A protein has these predicted regions:
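Glycine-rich phosphate-binding loop
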Residues: 68-140, 144-171
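Glycine-rich phosphate/pyrophosphate-binding loop and the adjoining helix
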Residues: 1-4, 168-174
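Short coil/turn connectors at secondary-structure junctions
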Residues: 2-5, 43-46, 60, 83-84, ...
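Glycine-rich phosphate/diphosphate-binding loops and the adjacent beta-loop-alpha structural elements
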Residues: 1-7, 11-26, 31, 91-92, ...
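Glycine-rich phosphate/diphosphate-binding loop of Rossmann-like nucleotide-binding domains
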Residues: 3-69
């Protein structure tokens, strides 16, 4: 079904360091991206998976590129996306990173540290915005207004397709 196609997929969370010990992340397991990669490889596609830190076995027949931060994922994707037929952005990439990370572990004190955050680069929008962009699939993890938010993301980022997931509550997760 997918023989001859080149597919680039992202999966898992990213981690944005605060200091050498602590980081900001999310609850993404990476399972969706890994299963999509497995299915594409079984279908005959040439698959590259750019993965954040997960506890999952590597899919057979898939080239896995391991990254940690949103910036590392951005660079890994943009360095590889040229020549791919399909891009599937299943990763839960951090929206923010810490402006100034501490080189040493921050000690607990009576005064809580204040973290200044900055927006990370939007991998999905950048891929979809390429002059010769691959067929681009995005994911929308939403706690409310699932359909409206997914449609807005589809249009705003000029995606070819979006997969909407209800998260939060007892049954919603990723």
């Amino acid at each position: 079904v997918m023989a001859g196609l080149c597919v680039l997929i992202t999966a898992g969370p990213t981690r944005e360091p605060i200091d050498p010990v602590r980081y900001i992340t999310n609850r993404s397991s990476g399972k969706m991206g890994y299963e999509v990669a497995r299915a594409a490889a079984r279908g005959g596609a040439s698959v590259t998976l750019v993965s954040g830190p997960v506890c999952l076995p590597k899919p057979d027949g898939v080239v896995v590129v391991e990254i940690e931060t949103a910036d590392e994922m951005y660079r890994a994707v943009m360095d590889r996306v040229q020549g791919h037929d399909i891009y599937i952005g299943a990763a839960a990439v951090a929206d923010y990173s810490v402006v100034e990370t501490s080189e040493r572990k921050m000690k607990k004190s009576d005064v809580a540290p204040q973290l200044l955050l900055t927006l990370t680069r939007d991998i999905l929008a950048n891929v979809a915005g390429l002059e010769q962009s691959p067929f681009t699939v995005g994911f929308a993890a939403e706690t409310d207004d699932l359909e409206a938010n997914a449609k807005q993301k589809l249009a705003a980022k000029k995606l070819d397709m979006i997969v909407a997931n209800q998260v939060g509550g007892e049954e919603g997760g990723f």
